[in-house]
Amino acid sequence: MLVDMHALAPSVDDLLAGAEDRRPFLNPDGRSTAAFEHVRIDGVAHVVKYLHVDDDFAMRVSGDVASRTVRAWRAGLLDAAPDLVDHAIVGASTGWGRNGWGAVLLMRDVSAELLPLGSETIPERQHAAFLDHLAGFCAATWGWRDDPVSGPGLLPYAARWAWFGHYAIEGERALGWPERVPRLAEEGWRRFGEVAPADVARLVEQLRWDVTPLAEAMRRTPSCFLHGDVKASNTGFTPDGRTVLIDWAYVGEGPACHELAWHLAIDRSRLPRSKEATVDAFRAGLERHGVDTGGWWDRQLSLCLLGAVVQFGWEKALGDGDELAWWCQAARESSAWL
Protein backbone atom coordinates (compact mmCIF):
# COMPACT_ATOMS: atom_id res chain seq x y z
CA MET A 1 0.00 0.00 0.00
CA LEU A 2 1.08 3.58 -0.62
CA VAL A 3 1.66 6.01 2.23
CA ASP A 4 0.53 9.59 2.70
CA MET A 5 2.21 12.31 0.69
CA HIS A 6 5.48 13.78 1.97
CA ALA A 7 5.74 17.56 2.34
CA LEU A 8 8.26 19.65 0.43
CA ALA A 9 10.53 22.12 2.17
CA PRO A 10 9.57 25.67 1.10
CA SER A 11 13.13 26.38 -0.06
CA VAL A 12 16.61 24.92 -0.17
CA ASP A 13 17.52 27.06 2.84
CA ASP A 14 14.65 25.53 4.79
CA LEU A 15 15.59 22.04 3.63
CA LEU A 16 19.16 22.49 4.85
CA ALA A 17 18.40 24.51 7.97
CA GLY A 18 20.88 23.56 10.67
CA ALA A 19 23.20 21.80 8.23
CA GLU A 20 26.85 21.88 9.24
CA ASP A 21 30.15 20.84 7.72
CA ARG A 22 28.92 21.29 4.15
CA ARG A 23 31.44 19.78 1.72
CA PRO A 24 30.93 19.47 -2.05
CA PHE A 25 32.01 16.18 -3.62
CA LEU A 26 32.01 14.34 -6.93
CA ASN A 27 29.94 11.19 -7.32
CA PRO A 28 32.49 8.53 -8.35
CA ASP A 29 29.84 6.65 -10.34
CA GLY A 30 28.16 9.72 -11.76
CA ARG A 31 27.26 9.82 -15.46
CA SER A 32 25.81 13.35 -15.08
CA THR A 33 27.36 16.60 -13.91
CA ALA A 34 24.94 16.97 -10.97
CA ALA A 35 26.38 18.59 -7.84
CA PHE A 36 26.54 16.84 -4.45
CA GLU A 37 27.34 17.86 -0.89
CA HIS A 38 28.13 16.03 2.32
CA VAL A 39 26.37 17.71 5.27
CA ARG A 40 25.68 16.94 8.89
CA ILE A 41 22.27 17.68 10.43
CA ASP A 42 21.83 17.13 14.16
CA GLY A 43 25.11 15.26 14.05
CA VAL A 44 23.89 12.77 11.42
CA ALA A 45 25.61 12.45 8.04
CA HIS A 46 23.49 13.28 5.00
CA VAL A 47 24.02 13.74 1.27
CA VAL A 48 22.49 16.57 -0.77
CA LYS A 49 21.91 16.13 -4.51
CA TYR A 50 21.12 19.05 -6.81
CA LEU A 51 19.01 18.07 -9.85
CA HIS A 52 18.53 20.14 -13.00
CA VAL A 53 18.04 19.51 -16.71
CA ASP A 54 21.19 21.54 -17.39
CA ASP A 55 23.25 18.95 -15.54
CA ASP A 56 21.67 15.65 -16.53
CA PHE A 57 21.34 14.03 -19.95
CA ALA A 58 18.40 11.81 -18.97
CA MET A 59 16.47 14.74 -17.51
CA ARG A 60 17.05 16.73 -20.70
CA VAL A 61 15.98 14.09 -23.19
CA SER A 62 12.87 13.18 -21.18
CA GLY A 63 11.84 16.74 -20.27
CA ASP A 64 12.16 16.20 -16.53
CA VAL A 65 11.37 19.59 -15.01
CA ALA A 66 11.19 19.89 -11.19
CA SER A 67 12.23 16.24 -10.77
CA ARG A 68 10.14 13.14 -11.20
CA THR A 69 12.05 11.70 -8.26
CA VAL A 70 10.57 14.37 -6.03
CA ARG A 71 7.05 13.84 -7.37
CA ALA A 72 7.27 10.09 -6.81
CA TRP A 73 8.64 10.61 -3.29
CA ARG A 74 5.89 13.11 -2.45
CA ALA A 75 3.26 10.65 -3.67
CA GLY A 76 4.61 7.96 -1.35
CA LEU A 77 5.48 5.61 -4.20
CA LEU A 78 9.04 5.11 -2.98
CA ASP A 79 7.60 3.86 0.32
CA ALA A 80 5.53 1.13 -1.31
CA ALA A 81 7.46 -1.69 0.39
CA PRO A 82 9.36 -0.19 3.36
CA ASP A 83 10.07 -3.61 4.87
CA LEU A 84 11.99 -4.53 1.72
CA VAL A 85 13.40 -1.34 0.17
CA ASP A 86 14.97 1.74 1.76
CA HIS A 87 15.17 4.75 -0.60
CA ALA A 88 17.14 6.94 1.87
CA ILE A 89 15.36 10.21 0.94
CA VAL A 90 14.37 12.30 3.96
CA GLY A 91 13.47 15.64 2.36
CA ALA A 92 13.25 17.64 -0.85
CA SER A 93 12.72 21.09 -2.27
CA THR A 94 11.85 22.31 -5.77
CA GLY A 95 12.34 25.59 -7.64
CA TRP A 96 16.15 25.40 -7.61
CA GLY A 97 18.41 26.66 -10.41
CA ARG A 98 17.74 28.22 -13.80
CA ASN A 99 14.06 29.02 -14.33
CA GLY A 100 13.29 27.18 -11.11
CA TRP A 101 13.36 23.93 -13.08
CA GLY A 102 15.52 22.01 -10.63
CA ALA A 103 15.12 20.29 -7.29
CA VAL A 104 17.22 19.32 -4.30
CA LEU A 105 17.15 15.99 -2.50
CA LEU A 106 18.27 15.41 1.08
CA MET A 107 19.23 11.81 1.79
CA ARG A 108 20.71 9.83 4.61
CA ASP A 109 24.35 9.08 3.85
CA VAL A 110 24.14 5.39 2.95
CA SER A 111 27.57 5.20 1.32
CA ALA A 112 28.78 2.65 3.87
CA GLU A 113 25.81 0.40 3.00
CA LEU A 114 26.27 0.42 -0.79
CA LEU A 115 27.91 -2.35 -2.77
CA PRO A 116 31.51 -1.48 -3.68
CA LEU A 117 32.08 0.02 -7.11
CA GLY A 118 33.95 -1.99 -9.71
CA SER A 119 33.46 -5.40 -11.28
CA GLU A 120 33.56 -7.55 -8.15
CA THR A 121 30.89 -10.26 -8.19
CA ILE A 122 27.89 -9.52 -5.99
CA PRO A 123 27.81 -12.02 -3.11
CA GLU A 124 25.25 -14.74 -3.85
CA ARG A 125 23.30 -14.19 -0.64
CA GLN A 126 23.00 -10.45 -1.24
CA HIS A 127 22.06 -10.97 -4.87
CA ALA A 128 19.29 -13.36 -3.88
CA ALA A 129 17.96 -10.82 -1.37
CA PHE A 130 18.16 -8.03 -3.95
CA LEU A 131 16.14 -10.01 -6.51
CA ASP A 132 13.54 -10.97 -3.92
CA HIS A 133 13.18 -7.43 -2.60
CA LEU A 134 13.02 -5.98 -6.11
CA ALA A 135 10.27 -8.47 -6.97
CA GLY A 136 8.47 -7.61 -3.75
CA PHE A 137 8.64 -3.91 -4.53
CA CYS A 138 7.14 -4.53 -7.97
CA ALA A 139 4.43 -6.69 -6.41
CA ALA A 140 3.55 -3.94 -3.93
CA THR A 141 2.61 -1.60 -6.78
CA TRP A 142 1.25 -4.24 -9.18
CA GLY A 143 -1.24 -2.74 -11.61
CA TRP A 144 -0.22 0.85 -10.81
CA ARG A 145 -0.85 3.38 -13.56
CA ASP A 146 0.33 6.97 -13.83
CA ASP A 147 -2.91 8.91 -14.27
CA PRO A 148 -2.56 11.38 -17.18
CA VAL A 149 -4.79 13.90 -15.40
CA SER A 150 -4.13 13.61 -11.68
CA GLY A 151 -0.52 12.48 -11.96
CA PRO A 152 1.94 12.27 -10.37
CA GLY A 153 3.32 12.68 -13.91
CA LEU A 154 6.42 10.50 -13.94
CA LEU A 155 8.51 9.16 -16.84
CA PRO A 156 6.21 8.61 -19.85
CA TYR A 157 5.80 4.92 -20.56
CA ALA A 158 7.68 4.76 -23.87
CA ALA A 159 10.40 7.24 -22.91
CA ARG A 160 12.58 4.76 -21.01
CA TRP A 161 13.41 2.95 -24.27
CA ALA A 162 14.36 6.20 -26.03
CA TRP A 163 17.32 7.28 -23.87
CA PHE A 164 19.78 6.42 -26.63
CA GLY A 165 17.48 6.79 -29.61
CA HIS A 166 18.37 8.96 -32.59
CA TYR A 167 16.59 12.07 -31.36
CA ALA A 168 18.25 11.95 -27.95
CA ILE A 169 21.72 11.52 -29.42
CA GLU A 170 21.16 14.25 -32.00
CA GLY A 171 20.04 16.63 -29.27
CA GLU A 172 23.16 16.02 -27.21
CA ARG A 173 25.35 16.46 -30.28
CA ALA A 174 23.71 19.83 -30.94
CA LEU A 175 24.58 20.88 -27.38
CA GLY A 176 28.24 19.98 -27.91
CA TRP A 177 28.20 16.75 -25.88
CA PRO A 178 27.94 18.17 -22.34
CA GLU A 179 28.23 14.61 -20.97
CA ARG A 180 30.46 11.76 -22.12
CA VAL A 181 28.00 8.85 -22.20
CA PRO A 182 25.82 10.04 -25.13
CA ARG A 183 28.92 10.65 -27.22
CA LEU A 184 30.20 7.17 -26.39
CA ALA A 185 26.77 5.81 -27.30
CA GLU A 186 26.95 7.38 -30.75
CA GLU A 187 30.24 5.58 -31.34
CA GLY A 188 28.76 2.35 -29.98
CA TRP A 189 25.72 2.51 -32.26
CA ARG A 190 27.98 2.87 -35.28
CA ARG A 191 29.81 -0.21 -34.12
CA PHE A 192 26.53 -2.06 -33.49
CA GLY A 193 25.55 -1.53 -37.11
CA GLU A 194 28.82 -3.11 -38.18
CA VAL A 195 28.95 -6.16 -35.90
CA ALA A 196 25.35 -7.10 -35.08
CA PRO A 197 23.49 -9.54 -37.37
CA ALA A 198 21.81 -7.60 -40.16
CA ASP A 199 18.24 -8.51 -39.13
CA VAL A 200 18.84 -7.47 -35.52
CA ALA A 201 20.65 -4.27 -36.50
CA ARG A 202 17.74 -3.36 -38.78
CA LEU A 203 15.13 -4.02 -36.07
CA VAL A 204 16.97 -2.03 -33.42
CA GLU A 205 17.61 0.83 -35.85
CA GLN A 206 13.88 1.06 -36.58
CA LEU A 207 13.04 1.13 -32.88
CA ARG A 208 15.66 3.77 -32.19
CA TRP A 209 13.76 6.01 -34.60
CA ASP A 210 10.34 5.09 -33.22
CA VAL A 211 9.95 2.96 -30.10
CA THR A 212 6.13 2.99 -30.33
CA PRO A 213 5.70 -0.61 -31.58
CA LEU A 214 7.78 -1.92 -28.68
CA ALA A 215 6.05 0.24 -26.08
CA GLU A 216 2.58 -0.69 -27.36
CA ALA A 217 3.43 -4.38 -27.21
CA MET A 218 4.70 -3.97 -23.65
CA ARG A 219 1.55 -2.12 -22.61
CA ARG A 220 -0.43 -5.25 -23.36
CA THR A 221 1.33 -6.86 -20.40
CA PRO A 222 1.01 -5.95 -16.68
CA SER A 223 2.53 -2.76 -15.27
CA CYS A 224 3.82 -1.62 -11.90
CA PHE A 225 5.85 1.28 -10.51
CA LEU A 226 9.49 1.10 -11.60
CA HIS A 227 12.68 2.41 -10.04
CA GLY A 228 14.05 2.24 -13.59
CA ASP A 229 17.79 2.17 -12.87
CA VAL A 230 18.38 -0.89 -10.71
CA LYS A 231 22.05 -1.78 -10.85
CA ALA A 232 24.83 -2.68 -8.45
CA SER A 233 26.13 0.87 -8.09
CA ASN A 234 22.67 2.03 -6.93
CA THR A 235 22.22 -0.87 -4.52
CA GLY A 236 23.16 -1.63 -0.93
CA PHE A 237 21.91 -3.34 2.19
CA THR A 238 20.86 -1.95 5.55
CA PRO A 239 22.10 -3.54 8.78
CA ASP A 240 18.62 -5.09 9.21
CA GLY A 241 18.81 -6.75 5.78
CA ARG A 242 16.64 -4.52 3.63
CA THR A 243 17.79 -3.46 0.16
CA VAL A 244 18.93 0.13 -0.31
CA LEU A 245 18.05 1.63 -3.68
CA ILE A 246 19.26 5.12 -4.56
CA ASP A 247 19.07 7.33 -7.66
CA TRP A 248 15.35 7.12 -8.44
CA ALA A 249 15.76 9.19 -11.60
CA TYR A 250 13.82 7.00 -14.06
CA VAL A 251 10.68 6.38 -12.01
CA GLY A 252 7.40 5.64 -13.70
CA GLU A 253 4.93 3.07 -14.91
CA GLY A 254 6.30 0.07 -16.74
CA PRO A 255 6.80 -3.70 -16.94
CA ALA A 256 8.52 -5.43 -14.03
CA CYS A 257 10.80 -7.30 -16.43
CA HIS A 258 12.33 -3.97 -17.40
CA GLU A 259 14.04 -3.92 -14.00
CA LEU A 260 15.34 -7.43 -14.59
CA ALA A 261 16.58 -6.77 -18.13
CA TRP A 262 18.30 -3.53 -17.06
CA HIS A 263 20.08 -5.40 -14.27
CA LEU A 264 21.15 -8.18 -16.64
CA ALA A 265 22.51 -5.68 -19.15
CA ILE A 266 24.39 -3.34 -16.82
CA ASP A 267 25.55 -5.76 -14.13
CA ARG A 268 26.45 -8.71 -16.34
CA SER A 269 30.07 -8.82 -15.08
CA ARG A 270 28.87 -8.81 -11.46
CA LEU A 271 26.23 -11.54 -11.59
CA PRO A 272 26.97 -14.48 -9.26
CA ARG A 273 24.76 -16.75 -11.40
CA SER A 274 23.85 -17.06 -15.05
CA LYS A 275 21.42 -14.70 -16.74
CA GLU A 276 18.95 -17.57 -17.03
CA ALA A 277 19.18 -18.39 -13.31
CA THR A 278 18.75 -14.70 -12.48
CA VAL A 279 15.61 -14.59 -14.60
CA ASP A 280 14.23 -17.65 -12.82
CA ALA A 281 14.98 -16.17 -9.39
CA PHE A 282 13.20 -12.90 -10.18
CA ARG A 283 10.15 -14.73 -11.50
CA ALA A 284 10.07 -16.92 -8.40
CA GLY A 285 10.27 -13.75 -6.30
CA LEU A 286 7.22 -12.28 -8.01
CA GLU A 287 5.31 -15.49 -7.41
CA ARG A 288 6.43 -15.57 -3.77
CA HIS A 289 5.10 -12.03 -3.30
CA GLY A 290 1.71 -12.90 -4.75
CA VAL A 291 2.01 -12.14 -8.47
CA ASP A 292 0.68 -14.78 -10.86
CA THR A 293 3.17 -14.84 -13.75
CA GLY A 294 1.19 -17.21 -15.93
CA GLY A 295 -0.08 -15.92 -19.25
CA TRP A 296 2.15 -12.86 -19.65
CA TRP A 297 5.66 -13.67 -18.42
CA ASP A 298 7.22 -15.01 -21.63
CA ARG A 299 5.90 -12.12 -23.70
CA GLN A 300 6.97 -9.40 -21.27
CA LEU A 301 10.39 -10.89 -20.57
CA SER A 302 11.16 -11.28 -24.26
CA LEU A 303 10.04 -7.75 -25.10
CA CYS A 304 12.06 -6.30 -22.22
CA LEU A 305 15.18 -8.10 -23.40
CA LEU A 306 14.66 -6.48 -26.79
CA GLY A 307 14.09 -3.20 -24.97
CA ALA A 308 17.45 -3.59 -23.25
CA VAL A 309 19.13 -3.94 -26.65
CA VAL A 310 17.39 -0.76 -27.80
CA GLN A 311 18.76 0.90 -24.66
CA PHE A 312 22.22 -0.67 -24.47
CA GLY A 313 23.03 -2.33 -27.77
CA TRP A 314 25.65 0.36 -28.25
CA GLU A 315 27.40 -0.69 -25.04
CA LYS A 316 27.28 -4.37 -25.97
CA ALA A 317 28.83 -3.58 -29.37
CA LEU A 318 31.83 -2.07 -27.59
CA GLY A 319 32.30 -5.19 -25.43
CA ASP A 320 32.99 -8.86 -26.05
CA GLY A 321 31.42 -10.87 -28.83
CA ASP A 322 29.76 -13.55 -26.69
CA GLU A 323 27.83 -10.97 -24.69
CA LEU A 324 26.71 -9.18 -27.84
CA ALA A 325 25.65 -12.48 -29.40
CA TRP A 326 23.49 -13.39 -26.37
CA TRP A 327 21.60 -10.11 -26.56
CA CYS A 328 21.25 -10.18 -30.33
CA GLN A 329 19.70 -13.64 -30.14
CA ALA A 330 17.30 -12.43 -27.44
CA ALA A 331 16.34 -9.46 -29.63
CA ARG A 332 15.77 -11.69 -32.65
CA GLU A 333 13.46 -13.98 -30.67
CA SER A 334 11.56 -10.97 -29.29
CA SER A 335 10.56 -9.69 -32.72
CA ALA A 336 7.76 -12.28 -32.89
CA TRP A 337 5.94 -10.45 -30.08
CA LEU A 338 5.80 -7.07 -31.87
Model-derived segments and spans:
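Catalytic activation segment of kinase domains across protein kinase-like and atypical kinase folds
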Residues: 233-263
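Regulatory N- and C-terminal appendages and interdomain linkers associated
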Residues: 1-30, 120, 142-152, 200-205, ...
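Conserved structural core of kinase catalytic domains
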Residues: 93-129
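Hydrophobic HxD+1 residue recognition
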Residues: 230
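ATP-dependent phospho-/nucleotidyl transfer catalytic cores
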Residues: 114-136, 143-227
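Short small-residue beta-strand/loop micro-motif enriched in glycine and branched aliphatics
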Residues: 56-58, 114-118, 245
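Active-site activation/catalytic loop segments of kinase-like enzymes and analogous catalytic loops
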Residues: 71, 75, 253-290, 305-334
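Conserved NTP-binding catalytic cores of kinases and kinase-like/nucleotidyltransferase enzymes
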Residues: 1-101, 105, 208, 214-218, ...
